[in-house]
């Protein structure tokens, strides 16, 4: 088991203090990492309003051919969405009503996750009628599973728990894994996030007033509850999305946190799904929430933008 290293918060304080000395504002959506700012989540490269059928969209995954697969947390339907337009191109039924929270394609097998921890695999999913098998495993009862991702380096599926995974891990957030070859679930978490490490007293640090004001009601990360998860196909980094705190964490494969983004509320009403394409572009879906319509946002890696854009965004 890897306990996620949160010693980076000391470095984070230094980064914020430096920002306070050089700028009067620190826009939400930019990273406060220990290494770089690969994405700017206040500046989407594309934004799509999704069909009303997807008001409860909860899971997102690339399924090939520039298409996204999506599920919503009420009905057992698989939605195929054109990533370039946000339009639904196909809908296929795979099961009855249920709280479906995650979806992921691993090689040619599609996995769909329910909040009770049940995982269904579909070897032949690109057909009019989907027939799947339930993966036999036993997650902790209080896990409330909401994220599933394929870690290709280990040939395993990762499952994130929204709630505390039991007494021995009280107050922590866990990520379990099951081996694709055997279907066996790890008995202990492969990653363990201690949310107590995310408590951060703003008053103890000399941030400027703009930063202090923005962080005052959002820096307490004790409410961090993973709602979506994705593995970067190029780097193997793990991205954990949280609706409650409107934030996004990036971890390396050793479990070290390398970046934190606070997501601007005007773009992220209820972020639930996340997927990353082979180019490194991040797609995040929002349930309808107060806006009354769901959205799909695309963010390109900052390193892929022109140098002039990078300079402009940093000013």
Please describe what each predicted stretch is.
Residues 22-315:
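Sequence/structural signature of beta-propeller domains
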Residues 18-20:
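C-terminal motif of bacterial Sec signal peptides marking the signal peptidase cleavage site
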Residues 1-9:
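Bacterial N-terminal signal peptides that target proteins for export
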Residues 8-16:
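Sec-dependent N-terminal signal peptides
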């Amino acid at each position: 088991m890897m306990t996620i290293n949160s010693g980076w918060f000391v470095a984070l304080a230094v980064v914020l203090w430096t920002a306070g000395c050089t700028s009067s504002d620190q826009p939400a959506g930019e990273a406060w990492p220990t290494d770089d700012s690969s994405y700017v989540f206040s500046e989407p490269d594309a934004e799509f309003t999704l069909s009303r059928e997807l008001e409860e969209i909860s899971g997102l995954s690339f399924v090939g051919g520039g298409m996204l697969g999506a599920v919503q947390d009420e009905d057992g339907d698989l939605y195929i969405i054109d990533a370039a337009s946000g339009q639904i191109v196909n809908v296929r039924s795979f099961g009855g009503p249920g709280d479906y929270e995650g979806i992921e394609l691993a090689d040619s097998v599609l996995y769909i996750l329910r909040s009770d921890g049940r995982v269904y695999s579909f070897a032949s999913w690109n057909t009019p009628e989907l027939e799947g098998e339930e993966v036999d495993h036993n997650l902790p009862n209080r896990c409330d599973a909401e994220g599933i991702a394929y870690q290709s380096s280990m040939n395993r599926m990762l499952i994130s728990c929204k709630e505390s995974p039991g007494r021995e891990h009280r107050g922590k957030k866990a990520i379990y894994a099951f081996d694709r070859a055997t279907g066996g679930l790890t008995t202990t978490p492969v990653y363990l996030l201690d949310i107590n490490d995310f408590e951060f007293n703003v008053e103890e640090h000399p941030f400027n007033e703009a930063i202090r004001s923005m962080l005052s009601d959002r820096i307490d990360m004790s409410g961090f509850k993973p709602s979506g998860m994705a593995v970067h196909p190029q780097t193997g980094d793990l991205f954990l999305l949280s609706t409650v705190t409107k934030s996004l964490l990036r971890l390396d494969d050793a479990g070290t946190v390398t970046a934190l983004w606070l997501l601007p509320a005007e773009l992220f009403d209820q972020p639930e799904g996340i997927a990353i394409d082979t180019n490194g572009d991040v797609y995040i879906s929002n349930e309808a929430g107060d806006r009354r319509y769901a959205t799909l946002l695309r963010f390109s890696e900052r390193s892929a933008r022109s140098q002039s854009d990078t300079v402009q965004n940093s000013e």
